[in-house]
């Protein structure tokens, strides 16, 4: 598909990111395979019908789109996948200035909506950690305590971890830094990363127990470099490893998806950390409105303090939860009633 000149032009004209290209490629491959035609043939056919001034309702394009949508609806694909694939096909046609005929509305099957009780608990995550190696322990603890999505997690580099922990070491080569961090139990790294879906930069943090497991994991990778991925997984490999955990534990499905997967760790974080929606959105990289993005900048130290006050809620091993020291305040309130002053302590 990437060798098709029309597809290459489409991606180049729209400056489509590689991750988004894969989504279009999947949808368009599915569409061309269903019709057993090439992209070039399908576009040429639609252009020829326009040049011949065939009424929209009588064009092959309308029949092709309706038949393809019916095929998707009868498949085992989720409603979201059906909508996404069909939308991408129409976008491709429109890019080449082909008018889309009016299509009748269709009712999509209601997708099962997960609720709080469908999410993994700390017990589930502990059970998963007991059956995997240090590589998966590191990534599971990172994702569940930071709420970072899979794409951003796999985009992190060793350098970002070393830089993010600079308050806890005095620098040096990777081995020296890891040896220093290995003996600390309070490391909460600060990560500044980009949300791949939206290009938004944001700050997030992970727990001390995640940091310790990351250090252990990095020490098992001799010759690791600053430019190397922090977590050495491809997206497909990570997906397969989560499937192995879920199926091995017999946890089954919730709706169309397996119970234990990377995205449910993100939901675990959002649903359990106990902060307001505003702070959860900050930590997970969800966008504010454009005015806020332009004028209001996040203070990472303040956000880190807020995160640390709540991170116990997403830490998995109780013995690793640090003590939270509360400050006591003495407040005097002056009240005036009927001309008299009362002090309440």
Model region roles, listed by residue range:
Residues 48-54, 98-127:
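Flexible interdomain linker/hinge and immediately adjacent N-terminus
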Residues 110-127, 187, 198-209, 224-228:
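DNA breakage-rejoining catalytic core of tyrosine-based enzymes
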Residues 122-151:
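Basic, Lys/Arg- and aromatic-enriched nucleic-acid-binding interface segment
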Residues 156-213:
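Conserved tyrosine-mediated DNA breakage-rejoining catalytic core shared by Y-recombinases
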Residues 195-216, 225-246, 262:
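C-terminal catalytic core of Y-nucleophile DNA break-rejoin enzymes
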Residues 222-228, 240-289:
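Short, basic (Lys/Arg/His-rich) helix/loop patches that form interaction surfaces
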């Amino acid at each position: 598909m990437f060798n098709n000149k029309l597809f290459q032009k489409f991606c180049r004209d729209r400056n489509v990111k590689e991750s988004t290209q894969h989504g279009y490629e999947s949808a368009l491959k599915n569409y061309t395979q269903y019709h057993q035609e090439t992209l070039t043939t399908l576009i040429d056919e639609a252009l020829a019908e326009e040049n011949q001034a065939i009424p929209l309702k009588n064009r092959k394009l309308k029949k092709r789109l309706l038949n393809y949508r019916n095929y998707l609806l009868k498949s085992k694909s989720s409603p979201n996948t059906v909508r996404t694939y069909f939308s991408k096909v129409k976008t491709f046609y429109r890019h080449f200035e082909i008018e889309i005929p009016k299509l009748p509305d269709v009712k999509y099957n209601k997708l099962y909506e997960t609720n709080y009780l469908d999410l993994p608990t700390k017990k589930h995550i502990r059970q998963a950690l007991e059956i995997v190696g240090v590589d998966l322990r590191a990534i599971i603890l990172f994702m569940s305590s930071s709420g970072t999505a899979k794409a951003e997690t796999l985009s992190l580099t060793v350098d970002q971890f070393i830089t993010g922990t600079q308050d806890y070491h005095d620098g040096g080569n990777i081995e020296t830094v890891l040896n220093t961090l290995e003996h600390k139990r309070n490391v909460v790294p600060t990560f500044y990363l980009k949300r791949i879906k939206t290009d938004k930069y944001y700050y997030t943090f992970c727990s001390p127990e995640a940091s310790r497991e990351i250090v252990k994991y990095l020490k098992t990778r001799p010759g690791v470099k600053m430019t190397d991925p922090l977590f050495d997984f491809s997206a497909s490999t990570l997906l397969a490893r989560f499937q192995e955990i879920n199926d091995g534990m017999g946890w089954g499905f919730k709706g169309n998806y397996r119970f234990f997967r990377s995205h449910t760790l993100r939901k675990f974080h959002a649903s359990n950390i106990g902060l307001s929606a505003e702070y959860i959105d900050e930590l997970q990289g969800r966008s504010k409105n454009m005015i806020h993005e332009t004028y209001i900048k996040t203070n990472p130290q303040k956000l880190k303090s807020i995160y640390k006050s709540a991170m116990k809620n997403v830490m998995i091993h109780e013995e690793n939860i640090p003590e939270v020291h509360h400050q006591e305040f003495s407040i005097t309130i002056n009240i005036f009633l009927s001309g008299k002053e009362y002090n309440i302590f």
